[in-house]
């Protein structure tokens, strides 16, 4: 079973004396988990640590223990910067070819992934001409092409309209990924598909559990209140 476990994790960025994460203990297994909290609470940094990119990409200092068991794919907020090829087809071909698949197998996977993500009609269009919502689906398709056991998404609803959000929720509920971790404050979209919510405050986990069981703590009322929008 794929899992991620953090034990007493502290993290800070280069040239900063302030710890962004402060003694985080968190374990995620085969489940759909949303990480929420106020702006500046450390959500994005936590996902970077959980995906393994924090030190590799940003450097800085990490203390504690991070255990990652399983193939991880990470889609950051700046997802469009990580699409390297001119068209979605070329992007998927590039990723799948690196997995030593034959040409026929690559084409089969492109067809499967494009149908799953609803980007079949976008495959040969230039990425720069796509809307933000369309680019986001391409970015998620690229992540799925890596055949991950753990998929981590940072603020996936930030650049899409309500209809696009409904479509994305439907997509996320049917991806078939063992472990799904999402950083998001628009909980109204995800309330019906998540197994657990983790609330961050000032770099610390202040609640981890079900939406229904969340305590009436003022530190977590703010993100949970978004369910009543």
Regions picked out by a protein language model, each given a short descriptive name:
Residues 1-6, 10-23, 54-59:
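A short, flexible loop at the N-terminus of ABC-type nucleotide-binding domains that lies
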Residues 104-122:
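Conserved ABC ATPase "signature" region
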Residues 140, 168:
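Hydrophobic anchor residue at the start of the ABC signature
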Residues 183-185:
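H-loop/switch region of ABC-family ATPase nucleotide-binding domains
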Residues 204-225:
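Conserved beta-strand-loop-alpha-helix hinge in the C-terminal portion
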């Amino acid at each position: 079973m794929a899992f991620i476990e953090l034990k007493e994790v502290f993290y800070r960025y280069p040239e900063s004396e302030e710890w962004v994460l402060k003694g985080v203990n968190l374990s995620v297994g085969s489940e759909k988990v949303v990480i929420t909290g106020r702006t500046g609470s450390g959500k994005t940094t936590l996902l970077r640590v959980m995906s393994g990119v924090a030190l590799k990409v940003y450097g800085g200092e990490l203390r504690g223990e991070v255990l990652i068991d399983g193939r991880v794919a990470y889609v950051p907020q700046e997802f469009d910067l990580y699409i390297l090829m001119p068209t979605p087809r070329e992007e998927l071909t590039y990723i799948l070819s690196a997995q030593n698949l034959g040409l026929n197998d690559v084409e089969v996977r492109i067809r499967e992934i494009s149908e799953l993500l609803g980007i079949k009609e976008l495959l040969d269009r230039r990425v720069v001409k796509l809307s933000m919502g369309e680019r986001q689906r391409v970015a998620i398709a690229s992540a799925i092409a890596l055949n991950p056991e753990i998929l981590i998404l940072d603020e996936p609803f930030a650049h899409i309209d309500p209809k696009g959000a409904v479509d994305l929720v439907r997509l996320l509920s049917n991806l078939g990924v063992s472990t799904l971790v999402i950083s998001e404050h628009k909980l109204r979209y995800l309330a019906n598909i998540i197994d657990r919510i983790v609330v961050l405050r000032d770099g610390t986990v202040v609640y981890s559990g079900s939406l229904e069981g969340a305590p009436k703590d003022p530190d977590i009322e703010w993100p949970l209140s978004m369910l009543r929008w």
